[in-house]
């Protein structure tokens, strides 16, 4: 936690000054916490035995990502010189360098997408290296565009649906047909929303890494499935 602060960090901890300082200056905690991640990154430069090929830091929510990573601005009003300023400079030498890539993760919903777009703008304004956008939990369309239009306007052929139910070996009923029509309408509305939000993200001209919704949840097999998709996107090749 106190990488580059050395004895000053130990003294601050013993005095309880860290908790006090981070209470009145919350940004200082971010400055202190990022130090360890940067120390791990620098192990590779020093060719240490405990170095890693890649270091992944799960940052705070998108709405405060720029403030969390732009540590120099966080300490500018607190310290112009001294160990805290030196620590911030050391952290920024890693975060703002070419060896760092900041990816954002979003869902295809209005608020998360807007937060992501705002986050990209804030990161770029801070001069921080934006990578790509991971689009999580996407749903493959079960209906084509024409069918979705009919579903949204309640014009799907109920009689044909009832016939298909009977062919599947189930007992057709008006109640079951109505349930399926309602689900089709909800699905069409959701797909149209995702299409529109994906278009907004595409306009950023950043790499998009689209990952599917896995209804069965996450287990080892699901992790391998997602890893295969990300590898196909080129993740892991310097990204």
Where in the sequence are the language-model features?
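Structural motif
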Residues: 56, 103-105, 134
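Conserved Walker B
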Residues: 59-60, 138
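Short, contiguous strand/loop micro-motifs
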Residues: 78, 106-107, 184-185
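Gly/Ser/Thr-rich loops at beta-strand to alpha-helix junctions
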Residues: 61-64, 109-112
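Short glycine-rich or small-residue beta-strand-to-loop segments that form or flank ligand, phosphate
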Residues: 38, 101-106
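C-terminal lobe/tail of nucleotide-utilizing enzymes
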Residues: 96, 100, 110-239
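Nucleotide-state-sensitive switch-loop elements of NTP-binding domains
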Residues: 1-56, 62-68, 73-92
């Amino acid at each position: 936690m106190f990488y580059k602060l050395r004895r000053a960090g130990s003294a601050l901890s013993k005095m309880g000054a860290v908790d006090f300082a981070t209470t009145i200056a919350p940004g200082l905690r971010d400055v202190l916490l990022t130090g360890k991640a940067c120390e791990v990154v620098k192990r590779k430069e020093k060719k240490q035995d405990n170095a890693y090929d890649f270091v992944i830091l799960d940052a705070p929510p998108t709405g405060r990502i720029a403030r969390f990573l732009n540590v120099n601005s966080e300490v500018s009003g607190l310290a112009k010189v001294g160990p805290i300023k030196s620590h911030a400079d050391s952290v920024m030498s890693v975060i703002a360098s070419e060896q760092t890539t900041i990816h954002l993760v979003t869902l295809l919903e209005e608020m998360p997408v807007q937060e992501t777009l705002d986050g990209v703008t804030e990161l770029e304004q801070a001069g921080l290296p934006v990578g790509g956008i991971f689009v999580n939990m996407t749903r493959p369309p079960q209906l084509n565009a024409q069918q979705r239009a009919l579903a949204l306007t309640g014009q799907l052929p109920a009689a044909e649906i009832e016939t298909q139910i009977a062919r599947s070996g189930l007992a057709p009923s008006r109640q079951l047909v109505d349930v399926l029509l309602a689900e089709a309408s909800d699905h069409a509305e959701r797909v149209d929303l995702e299409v529109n939000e994906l278009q907004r993200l595409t306009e950023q001209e950043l790499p998009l890494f689209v990952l599917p919704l896995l209804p069965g949840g996450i287990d080892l097999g699901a992790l391998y499935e997602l890893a295969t998709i990300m590898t196909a996107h080129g993740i892991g090749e310097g990204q």
